[in-house]
Amino acid sequence: MSNKDIRVVVGMSGGVDSSVTAHVLKDQGYDVIGIFMKNWDDTDENGVCTATEDYNDVIAVCNQIGIPYYAVNFEQEYWDKVFTYFLDEYKKGRTPNPDVMCNKEIKFKAFLEHALKLGADYVATGHYARIRRHDDGHVEMLRGVDNNKDQTYFLNQLSQQQLSKVMFPIGDIDKKEVRKIAEEQDLATAKKKDSTGICFIGERNFKTFLSQYLPAQSGEMRTLNGDKMGMHSGLMYYTIGQRHGLGIGGDGDPWFVVGKNLEDNILYVEQGFHHDALYSDYLIASDFSFVNPVDLDNGFECTAKFRYRQKDTKVFVQRESQNALRVTFDEPVRAITPGQAVVFYDEEVCLGGATIDDVFKTTGQLSYVV
């Protein structure tokens, strides 16, 4: 089968990465369709939402490269599957990663299902990741060539079935080359800056945005010894290891968030970047997903990331229970945060990931959320 007989539906955001993705596929002779996903009702609140501007950029790019385009509305799916999860996690005192859930439920589920109805053989996105396809039909997900832009961390929940239908055309090149291609082709998005906001919601004042959906309750900031250091403006606004926004003056080392007490609405803080309370030895995680089978019963060694762009840490992964994993670190790790993803790697291969629930020292539970 030649490329012209293979239909690829591209998820286009109005950014330079998805624009170049569509161009590369078109240039390679594929039957390409561009789809813009509208997943957030920008009339819901007063934040600056760029959906209209982004769609106009999609139209301009699709016209430039000569492919058909459509807009599809997934607002209900996004609200039900991603945003309610996002809010529920904050209510629990955790720090969620909406991009992970957005990829799992929207970009590679709702969008993939829609694309298949359009006769797609594959979907493609502008993610910095790679797919390795084997002769027996199974696939592996690899880190993007541009290590600084690699996005496998956010794609860790994708299944073998999903990835078998996915292409990541720019995963083999770095960001500078993507910009260069966009400029050489004079694409409308060539000089557009990268978005850094919440998946599909955009860039806005996070504190103001969150307060529109969750009522904030101020409370005391205390040290682990019980000394009162001030007041916090709502536990949901703080994350483990946070330094800024605490409002604690005085001499000496900076202060950092080391824990939350949900029941008594207390934010725990301690002084010093390397305070012992910020370090842990192992974690328990749930909602785990692996691209290919792994030996959880006997356990296995690999490396892991606990946040995006973090250096890999050597770990040992084993089954804790039917629905949970225990991940033990080779050396103590700082500021691991419940609600975030732990993502596993075997060199360049992304094995999968899970959601961090509880974090422990060897001597007992670390009181990040109590």
Curated annotation (Swiss-Prot):
Q: Does the keyword Acetylation apply?
A: no
List localization entries: Cytoplasm
Q: What is its main location?
A: cytoplasm
The record's listing under SUPFAM superfamilies reads: Adenine nucleotide alpha hydrolases-like
Intrachain disulfide bonds: 102-199
Among the GO molecular function terms of this UniProt record, one is:
tRNA binding
Q: Which family does it belong to?
A: Belongs to the MnmA/TRMU family.
Entry protein name: tRNA-specific 2-thiouridylase MnmA
